[in-house]
Amino acid sequence: MITKAPDGKLLWLEKGNGKAGLKHIVDGHAADFEAKGIKDIPSFLNEVLKAKPIKTGVGKNGPFADYLVNGVKYRVAYGTNGFIVSFYPID
């Protein structure tokens, strides 16, 4: 998946591995998304990225953006090159 964030930044999600990308997200956070009623994580991520983030910053592991969707906060962590490292609910 390749998309542009509202600020124009190019972001993309690859299959990845246990540390980053879709495999990391599914392995580490699938249950969190299921608890929110979300089954198709890549499609949901694509929808989330169309919204304007409520917060952006740089944490100890790199850049992130927080989004509010249906009353739930989600974090997208990405590399400086736009590679999506992780995605998960933070509420």
Sequence positions of predicted segments:
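Ribonuclease/tRNase effector modules and their secretory precursors
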Residues: 1-91
